[in-house]
Curated annotation (Swiss-Prot):
Family indicated by similarity: Belongs to the herpesviridae DNA primase family.
Function noted in UniProt: Essential component of the helicase/primase complex. Unwinds the DNA at the replication forks and generates single-stranded DNA for both leading and lagging strand synthesis. The primase initiates primer synthesis and thereby produces large amount of short RNA primers on the lagging strand that the polymerase elongates using dNTPs.
Region (Disordered), start-end ranges: 596-626
Self-association state and partner proteins as the record states: Associates with the helicase and the primase-associated factor to form the helicase-primase factor. Interacts with host SNAPIN.
EC number: 2.7.7.-
Location of the protein in the cell: Host nucleus
Name the UniProt record assigns to this protein: DNA primase
One Gene Ontology term from the biological process aspect of the record: bidirectional double-stranded viral DNA replication
UniProt keyword annotations, A-Z: DNA replication, Host nucleus, Host-virus interaction, Metal-binding, Transferase, Zinc, Zinc-finger
ZnF region ranges: CHC2-type: 881-920
Length: 946
């Protein structure tokens, strides 16, 4: 049968009803597309609103072609009058289309009988017929509708409509338009004006040369559709196959699926694919779209899956994608490049002295003490910042007064002003540890300690009496060490020093021991773990640690190298799990963070991890392990994992530790045996907290408690030892147990004590960098890094945008921006609009801190962050809180300007601050103003604040 798609210039439903009721009018119908097939009948069709089984047109009436002579109208490109359609109407074929509307017999009063003629049925059911036509069919009356839906050119409209409407297939209009562009690679015909009349539109389509190519296009589109389906099916298969065999954490797996499809179907890749499957005029119809089969799947494998196959294999990841730079030092103690010559000294002091000796003070007392030291030593030593940063600098410095004094005073260090006791003088020649002690009622004291009584105050004298020095299992050995337990805190800092102590990280000191804060997030429903599960977990983690250490640093002997494990005690049944980790701070809390870091501290992180994740599936304890529970932790399992770097090897920058933690986070998910153990019970991704490796961050020491934030005076969640003995000490484990009890082996900056003798020790070395080649930033994992590479719009480099703002178009290719240039940009273009919004929208007591007579100083910290300070003579000062008026306001709030880019040359600047009070969310980043600064050559409307 022959199908004719037609349109009208008047309401199509009424015109069709007139044809059905055989009511002549002056209207015409305009044939647009014709699908010929030898037949006496011609079916006139309209596009349906809904398509069942991809049928997008349906007939509204049929005519007898012998009477109508359709070819005569098509050849003349003329519309068909209604009179011709009425005269040729085939009622026998048309009536079944509307029979369901004529359910009730109609009686004619004039004839006294039932109406049976079709035209009379339509007349008496006129409203039902119109309603049916309007509900089922699309009835556009303007060419602009067809142009907006199917395309703006002659070939685009004709070929798209012919395939989309007449061929039973599942392609969308956008897909068919893409097929047309691949079929007509050179010319798509003339552009159709949107103001054309329906007659002009019909004449254009009926006379188009593209009508001769419809059959060829249909054959190509069918072949292309089949090829597209095969390609996408192969991509689906590859993505699912890798997902099933790869050991990906749940969240990473979801992101992987998105990344894989974005990689396979990226814009550049689809443009290449279009060239491969473009129409070949010289090829036979059956040979169309057969070049390079599996194109998208091969590219997906090359660009992503092959890389992920290596990146998510532990051996390949460590060998191919992790790069370590080590600097070998001179072994001569008098050389300038020896560890001694470079000042790579760790903590001194005594851990088993006769008494506790050191400085103890709150943040306010610390500020006063440092001010006093500055006053006493102003002519000899540089002034110290009146905060924890100043104390860390004081305790790390090896400088003495030899430049300005003679005799014995040349060995006099600035620490002597902090600890003037003469008996401590020999202990002050090396750096001192700085601790934070948590007191009841959420109070905190900072300590710089030269001597303490670690073993005598912390452990009972007979602690090791029942520990065997013979072959024992790790589980049995751990059970032989019993520690006395306390639960009520003391208000005395000296007493609480041995219960709630935290080591403060000092970036000015070398790191000898890698201290890992490992929080394993448990799946919902996991409320108990068997002893075997916990110890197998620790043994698996030790295996991963040793594999990473041997690959990154060498000179690692897995059968001898110590790894010390400590587990947070399980919460009692009466204590909520999420009471274990509330953030700490008060209004008197001073700055103790690195200025470039905005992450939460260890306690804040633990509190955050206690928030339940609704995205994990339920798992009951009985399905995890049927043995009695050894661990009753819910939500997360907290471990402290400490291991020294190989002998004679130190790290000198926090970024190295963050990179090592990033490598370990990834490696934990790649060990096959460990993954089998972890997958049913936990979400192992990002278990290591990298935020503790920043200047001024603190981490709880082993054997220490947490303070209960609700009760105020009670302690809980003590870090208890789990002894995982290396094979070399399995026969005589007592020495290893003693080493795990030794404080010197548990601190960031203390050289390890009683290290086992190694067959071959390396020369002195410094770890300069550890870098994941694919994910160089510790802030983003593999999936996030690769996702940035396939985004539609890429941000311009910050250096490029800064240079454009400084020098215009000529400087957009500058290789680097100096601190002086960055300061000039901030002063001239960034700070004025920020200050304007600050003075307009903030209280005067806040904004006046940034205006005259105060002199501001802008200190760049990299290219994207600038610290704002106030100059006070030779010193700098911070600001009071910009959000609240605290009960004890202090000038300890740090203010920064962040710079970031977008895909244009516009520059975004954000003014934010960091206040260390609990009311301001304990060191959280508080953004105050964000403005968009347009490039110099763009019109400059007022900066927009967000």
């Amino acid at each position: 049968m022959t199908l004719v798609l037609f349109a009208t210039e008047y309401d199509s439903a009424h015109i069709v009803a007139n044809v059905l009721s055989q009511t002549p009018t002056d209207h015409c119908v305009f044939p647009l597309l014709v699908k010929h097939q030898v037949s006496r009948r011609v079916y006139f069709c309209l596009q349906t609103q809904k398509c069942s089984d991809s049928r997008r047109v349906a007939p509204v009436f049929a005519v007898n072609n012998e009477t109508l002579q359709l070819s005569r109208y098509l050849a003349a490109r003329q519309p068909i009058p209604l009179s011709a359609l009425i005269a040729s109407l085939d009622e026998a074929e048309t009536q079944p289309l509307y029979r369901h509307l004529f359910r009730t017999p109609v009686l004619s009063p004039e004839h006294g009988g039932e109406v049976r003629e079709f035209k009379h049925l339509v007349y008496f059911h006129h409203a039902a017929v119109l309603r049916h036509l309007n509900q089922v069919f699309l009835c556009p009356t303007s060419p602009s509708w067809f142009i907006s839906v199917f395309g703006h050119t002659e070939g685009q409209v004709l070929l798209t409509m012919a395939y989309y409407l007449f061929e039973g297939q599942y392609s969308t209009i956008s897909t068919v338009e893409e097929y047309v562009r691949s079929f007509c690679t050179r010319d798509l015909g003339t552009i159709i004006p949107t103001h054309a009349s329906m007659g002009e539109f019909a004449r254009l389509l009926l006379g188009s040369p593209f009508r001769q190519r419809v059959s060829a296009f249909v054959a190509y589109a069918v072949a292309r559709n089949r090829r597209d389906y095969t390609e996408l099916e192969q991509v689906d298969t590859q993505i699912n196959a890798f997902r099933e065999r790869a050991r990906l954490p749940d969240t990473v797996c979801v992101h992987y699926v998105y990344l894989a499809y974005r990689t396979a179907l990226a814009r550049a890749r689809l443009l290449e694919y279009r060239r491969v499957v473009a129409y070949d005029a010289d090829a036979a119809p059956e040979a169309q779209c057969t070049r390079e089969p599996g194109f998208l799947g091969r590219r997906l494998s090359t660009e992503l899956l092959d890389v992920m196959q290596k990146y998510f294999s532990l051996d390949n990841f460590l060998h191919d994608y992790v790069e370590t730079h080590l600097l070998r030092l001179d072994e001569s103690p008098h050389s300038a490049t020896s560890p001694h010559g470079l000042g790579l000294a760790g903590y001194g002091g005594r851990i088993d002295g006769t008494h506790l000796a050191g400085f103890f003070g709150t943040s306010t007392q610390l500020a006063r003490q440092l001010e006093r030291i500055n006053t006493l030593s102003e002519s000899v030593f540089s002034p110290l910042e009146r905060s924890l940063s100043g104390l860390l600098r004081l305790c790390a410095s090896l400088r003495t007064a030899q430049t300005y004094t003679t005799g014995t005073l040349t060995r006099y260090s600035q620490r002597r002003y902090l600890l003037p006791e003469p008996a401590l003088a020999p202990l002050l020649e090396r750096p001192l540890p700085v601790y934070r002690v948590h007191l009841p009622n959420d109070q905190h004291v900072f300590c710089a300690v030269a001597s303490e009584t670690w073993h005598r105050s912390l452990f009972p004298r007979d602690l090791l009496r029942h520990v065997p020095d013979s072959r024992f299992s790790d589980e049995a050995l751990t059970e032989t060490v019993w520690l006395h337990d306390d639960d009520v805190a003391s208000t005395s800092p000296e007493t609480q020093f041995y219960y709630t102590r935290h080591e403060v990280f000092n970036e000015r000191l070398p790191v000898f021991n890698f201290v890992a804060d490992f929080d394993l997030r448990l799946r919902d429903g996991v409320s108990g773990l068997a002893r075997h599960t916990v110890f197998e977990l620790c043994r698996g983690l030790r295996r991963v640690w040793m594999t990473v250490w041997a690959s990154l640093f060498g000179y690692t002997h897995p059968d001898r190298h110590p790894v010390y494990f400590f587990k947070s005690a399980c919460p009692p049944n009466s204590v909520p799990v999420d009471a274990a980790g509330a953030p700490f701070d008060d209004d008197d809390y001073l700055d103790y963070r690195d200025e470039r870091d905005t992450e939460e501290d260890e306690d804040g992180k633990e509190n955050k991890n206690n928030v339940p994740d609704n995205g994990v599936f339920q798992k009951t304890t009985s399905s995890v392990d049927t043995s009695p529970p050894y661990c009753r932790c819910k939500g997360k399992l907290g471990l402290r994992i400490i291991t020294p770097f190989p002998a004679c090897t130190v790290a000198v920058h926090p970024s190295v530790l963050r990179a090592v933690a990033q490598v370990l986070n990834h490696a934990v998910c790649l060990d096959a045996e460990l993954h089998t153990l972890l997958d049913p019970i936990s979400h192992p991704e990002s278990s290591l907290d990298t935020g503790i490796y920043h200047h001024g961050r603190s981490v709880r020491l082993p054997y220490m408690y947490k303070m209960d934030q609700d009760d105020g005076y009670f302690m809980h969640r003590r870090l208890l030892p789990l002894f995982i003995v290396p094979d070399a000490y399995r026969e005589h484990p007592l020495g290893f147990v003693r080493a795990q009890l030794d404080l010197r082996n548990l601190l960031h900056h203390h050289p390890p004590h009683d290290l086992p003798a190694l067959p071959l020790s390396p020369p002195p070395r410094v770890i300069l960098s550890v870098r994941d080649k694919i994910c160089p930033s510790t802030e983003a994992n593999f999936i996030e890094t690769r996702s940035l590479n396939v985004t539609r719009y890429r941000r311009r480099g910050l250096t490029e945008v800064l240079a454009y703002h400084l020098y215009g178009g000529d400087g957009a290719t500058a290789a680097a921006i100096s601190d002086t240039d960055l300061q000039r940009l901030v002063v001239t273009r960034v700070w004025p609009p920020l200050l304007e919004h600050l003075t307009q929208h903030y209280e005067p007591h806040v904004s006046e801190q940034f205006t005259a007579p105060h002199v501001l100083l802008f200190q760049p910290h990299g290219a994207c962050c600038v610290a704002v300070k106030r100059r006070d003579g030779a010193r700098t000062r911070d600001f009071r809180c910009l959000n609240y008026t605290h009960r004890n306001p202090q000038e300890t709030v740090q203010v920064f300007i962040d710079l970031r880019t977008e895909h244009s040359y516009a520059l975004w600047a954000s003014l934010w601050s960091r206040c260390f009070t609990k009311k301001c969310h304990s060191n959280a980043k508080n953004v105050h103003i964000s403005i968009k600064i347009r490039p110099p050559d763009a019109p400059m409307p007022p900066a927009t604040a967000v």
